[in-house]
């Protein structure tokens, strides 16, 4: 399904290895090259949507990220889309608040104290100008949207995994952005 890209230790490495092996044997793996290229583009798509929403005025905005690991049920952040998002947000002058049920320690190891490490998903949303769903953990599927909306400075939700229903979220008073729709 549409999303903000894949990561992890196996699939990205395997795709690169297949491309390289084919090249060494005189072949071009155009489909795999396209897969790799599109995956890298997808990792920036939420950032681009955020820029468009705020007319590129992101300096000093507070952005919350739900999910840091490359997939749910792990703390593995290898090639995770969250790393690219965090770097882009910090480089443009955003304040970043993050929460992941398992990958907080790994995130701190990778990026240090340049972000705020929230105690839970509600703490991450506190005073946020926008909330980005990056990893589709089960606990993010049914939050108390009233609590989230009240906690946020502006109720803007960027759904990087298309787990929410646009109509439902918008009826709750959020501006909703998703992938591919």
Question: What is each residue range found by the language model?
Answer:
Residues 1-181:
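Structural/interface elements that position substrates and couple domains in central-metabolism enzymes
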